[in-house]
Amino acid sequence: MTEMIKSKDVSFQYLHTSEAFLKEINLTVGKGECILICGESGSGKSTYSRLLNGISPNYIEGELAGEHYTANLKAGEAEIEAYVPVVGSVFQNPKTQHFTVDTMSELAFPLENTGAHPDFIREKIEQNATAFNVEHLLGRNIFEISGGEKQQIAFVAANMLEPAVLILDEVTSNLDQEAISRIREMVLNLKERGQTIIIFEHRLAWTKGLVDRYILLDQGRITKEWPADEFLELSTGELHGLGLRSMDLDKQRKMIQKKLNQPKNKINHTLSAENLSIGYPGYPVLSDLDLSFDAGEVTGLLGPNGTGKSTLANTLTGLQESISGQIYWNNKKITKKELTQKSYMVMQDMNYQLFSDSVENEILLGAKHPQYLDQILKALNLTEFRDRHPMSLSEGQKQRVVIASALLSGKEMIIFDEPTSGLDYEHMERFGKLLNDLKKSKAVIIVITHDEELASKWCDSIVKLNK
């Protein structure tokens, strides 16, 4: 077997930290294998992915012990540019990996940096667009396509140099089912070509039938390993006991259908919209919406990427003007400014909302109920990070910090935009329980999500938007 990944007694500790994030990792991955590395937020998944693609220790520095090879590149010795033709990476947030403003230029970018001839570049773009079924996206403005479409372009761009190893780091966390299905087809395409694929993921259901081995990371160590057939035999209870998400979502999808557009018996609603049209001048996204939301209730807002869920959230919080229609609060017309004063929104990209130099200061910034700080830190498993800089945390941990800020804000309306995108099963459950507690404050709570496990269990009612 040709070894594409080999870690022998690998430990890694970032500079200025007191503990190693990877501890005595031993793992070998053969050519053509597709493996999935799972584990709770902060278990070391992102750190290991950075070791695989050379970002650590070349760019994000730290102390490396043991030996690690990606293909024939030895970590700590090979320069970062040597990894470019060997390893392709696709990350959780496609915005962080786009370098141009249109899709053609985005796909051309990797080859342009090698000095390839323009005719060859055009030929490779056409070949890959056809192979990965993204011809319809060619020539589009990056800023005018959905999150799922951006992720597909990022996926194709990562493969333009035909790397021997592809790393997928939480690539489905912000995607709807249609977009996940497209990503799955792309991965299957590469697997059939014999490419080595390493998937880091919380959402496991889409990987059924793709993955050859499942690896569990826990506090920086590999604690369990299963061949695919053995992993698929684990019950939902056993998966949850390991802190992992469900492999079968049929039950959750049936519950969502049951909660979908349930008739409301109340006549008077806390927040309501009539004939609301939203979007941008000359470009309406949604038209003639009639919606209602009640205090003390969690409403899930579902729908495919690009349907206008985030645009609706921006409008309801006063961050964006509506095109037409009216919004009411307790049956009285409410202004854009008043909506902003009443609301708090946890954005999909939490990095826009982190300002302070420690987790504690971040959560207390604008807090109306600072006396509950310790309780919230404990509930979201953040106590040990209270003195850490928020930007030094994993994506899932950052997500929990912003959620904590929202919970202490004391606002009358809180909107969460994809709040569990980087969260494992345990922390998704913790967040759900906090939503349940938040209902006692009689706030209007809206959760924009693709997370079927969250929506089915913790949302009282569900509204689905369609294109």
Annotated model-derived regions:
Residues 67-82, 326-339:
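ABC ATPase NBD Q-loop/coupling interface
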Residues 201-202, 449-450:
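H-loop/switch region of ABC-family ATPase nucleotide-binding domains
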Residues 119-137, 370-385:
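Conserved ABC ATPase "signature" region
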Residues 38-40, 302-304:
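The feature captures the beta-strand-to-loop junction immediately N-terminal to the Walker
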Residues 53, 317:
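Helix-to-loop junction immediately C-terminal to a conserved catalytic motif
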Residues 166-169, 414-417:
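Catalytic Walker B motif of ABC-type/P-loop ATPase nucleotide-binding domains
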Residues 141-145, 149, 389-393, 397:
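Conserved ABC ATPase signature
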